[in-house]
Curated annotation (Swiss-Prot):
Pfam families: Phlebo_G2_C, Phlebovirus_G1, Phlebovirus_G2. Residues 461-465 are annotated as: Important for correct targeting of the glycoproteins to the Golgi complex but not for heterodimerization. This is Envelopment polyprotein. GO terms for biological process: entry receptor-mediated virion attachment to host cell; fusion of virus membrane with host endosome membrane; symbiont entry into host cell; viral budding from Golgi membrane; viral budding via host ESCRT complex. The record marks K1006 as: Important for glycoprotein C and glycoprotein N subcellular location. Residues 416-496, 999-1008 are cytoplasmic. Keywords: Disulfide bond, Fusion of virus membrane with host endosomal membrane, Fusion of virus membrane with host membrane, Glycoprotein, Host endoplasmic reticulum, Host Golgi apparatus, Host membrane, Host-virus interaction, Lipoprotein, Membrane, Palmitate, Signal, Transmembrane, Transmembrane helix, Viral attachment to host cell, Viral attachment to host entry receptor, Viral penetration into host cytoplasm, Virion, Virus entry into host cell. It comes from Uukuniemi virus (strain S23) (UUKV).
């Protein structure tokens, strides 16, 4: 017995397909042709497979055109074809004409898989030979074509059917729900379907009482010549005597009624088809940068005048020298103020201007010639005008002399008044003082006499008063007493001189300056010389170098084993930005609500028992549309009980079921990325240049970037300022950025961006079920057969157009960048970069050329971002050489590419003193020259030059100290003559006094 069971178990596995096949054949022989056809339709045809008692699309015979030849001419590319195997006919609807076409093969032929031709293969009994492309159902009772409202959809085109004009379209293949009556097709986005019972003959099966045939002419029932059950006699007039037909309620679910915003109707057919559609696409809103052809600019001493003609300017961003300024223009002619230091050298400037709509960006480029350092100070009452004495005009000198004279007179008057007051007071106090002093002297004399008497009495009583050794000690004590005060007096005089000496030493100290260059010497062990005299060295180093302000360079000078400079790596700062470190939150679609509903009378379809209360939020009803696409979208499913009985077109008195699906439809194919700024960090763009390469790099803290045979990174940077903005930013598909108030993740507060949150762009474009929102975003109210839905979903496109960047929020101006957002903050940063070289190759020849440099000028400002400009001219006797200028007292080193033609070069120096006079050395391969650089620099206080609607972008702080050097002008060249006269006069007076004292001393000695 056990063996028998084991044998059956072993046979069950292999025999299962055979039994399944046998059951399928049996079912096909027993079932009706309609049931077999429904079962053999594709699995995606949920609607046509819904109920075996509902009429299929094959029943609309008069509207079907059969095609037996040239099938490929009728297969248009707005469908996706798959005829599988064993299909002899393909029926499909043309959305433009509203007609049905049936591709048909002969009896012994079947359609190919792509449906384009017929192949010699007979159809099988195991699969229905009729295939319908469209998932649809039909009914016998329907309204007239005029009862259908016009199209109400966001689609522009469906295949060849043109619905509405769209300027910008996006093509997509999707399932489209449609409704059809007698060759007329309509498409709606929002609709509901109710299945009603009532005075419809299609809900009853009538039997001819005489012939017992079901082919009874139902038209006679409308004349009252039929009898039937209670439901039939309730709706129609029954004749119980000599009735032609006897009618009973069949199993058809009811008659479908479609409800739209503009009316209701009964369709002849309704379904859903996979078609190629065109959806509206929003206009590309990316900001286009273009030159401002008819704009003018004029460089003034303290501002740039800009004139715009063909558009109305709004936000602008202007950079001159090391300063970048942002603001808003009030008119077509506006001024952009700049720091005085930015006019001390020839500077290229660039202005970016946005129009009022912020959809077009224009740029204007030009150059401002330098002005004299003293001429750059154009203000009268500002601090810079009175801090630089060597820039004083004649009027200022006269004012200074007058003010000094007035101060001296005022001081003399005060001293004279104090003297008069003191003299008058002394005259009053003098008698009292004389009496008091007389009393004090009298008392002191008496006390001294008594003390002497007492002392003499004590000494007389003591023994040993006549000791011989006491005499010498008493004689030496007065000498010591006299000597000690002399030593103290000398020490006191020395301490009085100490502050003066310290002050003189402080004035004698040289000025200090941070270097913007460092040198690296190659090891001789890693150098080699080729046969043609070319030396090759490999350099490996890790060096820290301070980042220069905008428009200036930092240099890494590479030297050979002999200490001769042979190459350099230049790092020029192009700009500095305070950029948002973005943290993506979610994607937001641009949608509106969409509600789909269908009502079933009790005991019809799925409305049975407690089915309505058991209906879940993710359940599906076939009348809603294509399940795969509809249920893949974010939405919520509900079942709402409605009335039953005759008043609600139902035969059953129990409540009917209204199946509701709340979902969304796109306003356009747009999605918006919403992100917040977790922090703000500096981003410094630099140009790294060697003798053979040029690379544009971006320096970020802790993010290295590659250079030839090395890496460069931002080693340290000052703490960025706190940005008083805690809201979000958004970005559309074209890169246009905007600021907005938004919900954070898992917060779905209505009325702000983030009511719907999608994890990816693809999810937002499809409003997939991976998106998250609250079902309260759509308010719905069911009215028996229809549903009224309302929503106030925020349109991100409106927010984008209103808050497009650049924009000023509070006191901060935000500017769009390629990947993030930049904030304009008037702060100076201090940054250091790390340069790592590993096997960097330098090649050079041992030349013997000499250099001839000459100092021309040194002008500009000290302790400022722009720095001072050092101008030299240089030339070699032959060839090209790399010259190094070193100023040890200033801590400054830089390089020059010296050629055999006379050239002028300008370098930037950062100093912290007003008067400069230092010895420098200019070294070439076969020469060393000594230069003396001299100059008078000015100090420009960091005054706020902005208007009320302007903001300074962040910059880099100067490499020297900060502050005003108030005593530096004492060393100015124009004061040297004065100091020489004063010094000569004082020296003459001191010499005369010394000679007189020596002469007097000699006379006293001679007389004694």
């Amino acid at each position: 017995m056990v063996r028998t069971y084991l044998l059956l178990l072993l046979l069950c596995g292999p025999a299962t397909p055979f039994f399944n096949h046998l059951m399928d054949v049996t079912r096909r022989l027993l079932d009706s042709s309609n049931a077999t056809w429904q079962r053999d339709q594709p699995d995606t045809h949920r609607l046509s497979r819904l109920d075996a008692h509902v009429m299929s699309m094959l029943g609309v015979g008069s509207h079907i055109d059969e095609v037996s030849v040239n099938h490929s001419q009728h297969l248009h590319n707005f469908r996706s074809y798959n005829c599988e195997e064993g299909r002899r006919t393909l029926t499909m609807m043309d959305p433009k004409s509203g007609k049905f076409k049936r591709l048909k093969c002969n009896e012994n032929q079947t359609l190919s898989k792509d449906c384009a031709s017929c192949i010699e293969k007979k159809s099988s009994i195991m699969k229905s030979e009729h295939l319908v492309y469209d998932d649809a159902i039909c009914q016998s009772d329907y309204s007239s074509p005029e009862a259908m409202p016009d199209h109400e959809t966001h689609l522009c085109r469906i295949g060849p059917l043109h619905i509405q004009h769209c300027t910008h379209e996006a093509k997509r293949v999707q399932h489209v729900s449609w409704f059809w009556i007698d060759g007329k097709l309509r498409v709606y986005d929002d609709f509901s379907v109710s299945w009603t019972e009532g005075k419809f003959l299609s809900l009853f099966d009538c039997l001819n009482e005489t012939s017992k045939d079901h082919n009874c002419n139902k038209a006679v029932c409308l004349e009252g010549r039929c009898s039937g059950d209670l439901q039939f006699c309730t709706e129609f007039t029954c004749s119980y005597a000599k009735a032609d037909c006897n009618c009973k309620r069949n199993q058809v679910s009811g008659v479908a009624v479609v409800h739209t915003k503009h009316g209701s109707f009964m369709p002849e057919c309704m379904g859903q088809s996979l078609w190629s559609v065109r959806k509206p696409l929003s206009k590309r809103s990316v900001t286009v940068q273009q030159p401002c052809m008819d704009c003018e600019s004029d460089c003034k001493v303290d501002h740039i005048l800009v004139i715009v003609r063909h558009f109305y300017p709004d936000h602008y961003q202007a950079c001159l020298g090391s300063t970048c300024l942002t603001g808003r223009a009030k008119d077509k002619e506006f001024k952009i103020p700049f720091k005085m230091a930015d006019r001390l050298s020839d500077s290229h400037f660039e202005i970016r201007i946005w129009d009022k709509e912020r959809s077009n960006e224009y740029f204007l480029e030009s150059r401002c010639e330098s002005v004299d350092a003293c001429a750059a100070i154009t203000c009268w009452f500002c601090r810079a005008n009175w801090a630089n004495i060597h820039c004083f005009s004649k009027e200022q000198v006269l004012i200074l002399v007058a003010v000094s004279s007035l101060c001296i007179l005022l001081l003399a008057s005060v001293l004279r008044a104090l003297k008069v007051i003191a003299t008058f007071t002394w005259k009053i106090i003098k008698p009292f003082w004389w009496i008091l002093s007389l009393l004090c002297r009298t008392c002191s004399k008496r006390l001294n006499k008594r003390a002497e008497r007492l002392k003499e009495s004590i000494h007389s009583l003591e023994e040993g008063l006549n000791n011989v050794d006491e005499g010498p000690r008493e004689q030496n004590n007065p000498a010591r007493a006299v000597a000690r005060p002399n030593v103290r007096q000398k020490m006191f005089n020395l301490t009085r001189l100490s502050p003066v000496v310290v002050g003189m030493l402080c004035l004698a100290c040289p000025v200090e300056s941070c270097s913007d260059s460092i040198s690296v010497t190659a090891s001789s062990q890693r150098c080699s010389t080729s046969s043609d005299g070319v030396n090759s060295c490999f350099v490996s180093t890790s060096s820290l170098l301070q980042v220069s302000p905008k428009g200036q360079e930092s240099c890494l000078i590479l030297k050979g084993p002999t200490g001769t400079a042979v190459d350099s790596i230049r790092i020029k700062t192009t700009d500095i930005k305070l950029e948002c470190v973005r943290r993506d939150l979610y994607w937001v679609p641009r949608v509106t609500h969409r509600c789909i509903g269908t009502r079933r009378c009790h005991l019809m379809g799925a409305c049975k028992g407690e089915a309505c209360s058991e209906f879940k939020i993710n359940d599906y009803s076939p009348e809603w549309g294509h399940e795969e696409e509809l249920m893949a979208q974010l939405g919520w499913s509900y079942c709402v009980e409605q009335c039953g009985g005759a008043l609600c077109q139902c035969f059953n008195m129990r409540p009917s079921c209204f199946y509701l699906r709340k979902t969304f439809s796109h306003l356009s194919q747009d999605a918006f990325n919403i992100y917040e700024c977790s922090e703000w960090s500096y981003r410094i763009n630099v140009l790294v240049s060697t003798n053979s390469t040029h690379s544009n790099l971006t320096l970020k803290l802790g993010v290295p970037d590659s250079i030839p045979h090395g890496l460069i990174s931002l080693s340290s940077v000052s703490q960025p300022p706190a940005i008083a903005y805690s809201e979000c930013f958004g970005e559309d598909l074209h890169g246009t950025k905007f600021h907005t108030v938004c919900n954070r993740r898992t917060d779905y507060t209505l009325g702000r961006i983030g009511e719907i949150q999608c994890p990816t762009k693809a999810d937002a474009l499809a409003v997939s079920k991976r998106c998250i929102s609250s079902d309260s975003i759509i308010f719905s109210k069911v009215h028996k057969d229809s549903v009224d839905c309302q929503s106030s979903i925020i349109d991100p496109m409106t927010i984008r157009n209103r808050n497009k960047l650049p924009s000023t929020v509070g006191s901060v101006t935000f500017w769009p960048t390629e990947t993030s957002v930049e904030a304009a903050i008037p702060d100076l940063a201090s940054a250091t970069m790390l340069i790592r070289l590993d096997g960097y190759t330098i090649q050079f020849r041992s030349d013997s050329n000499k250099c001839s440099p000459r100092f021309l000028s040194l002008s500009g400002c000290y302790n400022c971002e722009a720095g001072a400009k050092l101008e030299l001219e240089h030339v070699t006797d032959f060839g090209t050489a790399l010259g190094i200028l070193e100023c040890p007292s200033l801590g400054y080193t830089t390089y020059y590419e010296v050629k055999n033609t006379l050239e002028k070069s300008i370098r930037t120096m950062h100093l912290n003193g007003s008067h400069v006079e230092a010895k420098c050395y200019f070294r070439c391969p076969n020469s060393e020259s000594q230069l003396t650089i001299r100059g008078e620099l000015i100090y420009l206080f960091n005054d706020d030059i902005r208007h009320h609607n302007q903001t300074l972008s962040p910059g880099l702080s100067p490499k020297s100290g900060s502050g005003w050097d108030p005593f530096g002008w004492f060393k100015a060249s124009w004061l040297r003559a004065i100091w020489a006269i004063l010094g000569g006069t004082v020296s003459l007076i001191i010499g005369v006094v010394i000679i007189y004292m020596v002469f007097t001393l000699c006379l006293k000695v001679k007389k004694s």
